[in-house]
A protein has these predicted regions:
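A short, N-terminal "cap"/entry segment at the start of jelly-roll beta-barrel domains
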Residues: 1-44, 126-144
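Conserved short histidine dyad/triad with adjacent acidic residue
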Residues: 31-33, 48-63
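A short hydrophobic beta-strand segment most commonly corresponding to one strand
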Residues: 49-50, 94, 109-126
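A generic "binding-loop/recognition-motif" signal
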Residues: 56, 64-65, 83, 99-100, ...
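Short beta-strand His + acidic residue motifs that chelate non-heme Fe in jelly-roll/DSBH
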Residues: 59-60, 78-79, 95, 101-107
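Glycine- and acidic-residue-biased ligand/ion/polar-headgroup-sensing regions
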Residues: 66-76, 81
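Short acidic-glycine-tyrosine-enriched beta hairpin
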Residues: 82-97
Length: 144
């Protein structure tokens, strides 16, 4: 179990070890590891790492909160409204709240993406304009 430390005002600040967080299959070819979420005690931000197989994609959807994607590895396409972009390692994409978007791995190898979402649960109020929602419940640290 990860250690925690008392912060100012007696708040507990968890230290989360990624090796203690299981990776879940969010949709075919897309796995997720929630690095920070409400399940970990985070209240204002969620962090998620996706590992994405070649050709795998998330369908058109929108969130009520802003999100940011950082491409760590690979090449992905991103659709924002009517525009389509190709982005690679170290590129950052800021997706405003309520903007329909989709994305997928367009490269020959695995892609790895880091996501940051504002709010307590970015998936709760998501609207899928195509396809179905992903599995999005982050497991608690130390649980399978």
């Amino acid at each position: 179990m990860s250690p925690s430390f008392a912060g100012s005002g007696g708040n507990t600040l968890p230290v989360i070890k990624p090796q203690e967080i299981p990776e879940i299959e969010m949709r075919p070819g897309i796995r997720g590891q929630f690095l920070a979420s409400a399940a970990h005690g985070a209240r204002g931000v969620w962090l998620l790492v996706n590992t994405v197989d070649p050709g795998a994609a998330a369908p058109l959807h929108k969130h009520t909160v802003e999100e940011t994607m950082v491409v760590l590895e690979g090449t992905v396409w991103v659709r924002l409204g009517d525009e389509r972009y190709t982005v690679g390692p170290q590129h950052t994409v800021i997706i405003p709240a309520e903007i329909p978007h989709a994305w997928g791995n367009s490269g020959p190898g695995m892609a790895k993406l880091l996501w940051a979402f504002g709010g307590p649960d970015p998936f709760h109020d998501s609207i899928y304009l195509e396809g179905s929602p992903p599995v999005s419940s982050p497991p608690m640290p130390g649980q399978p």
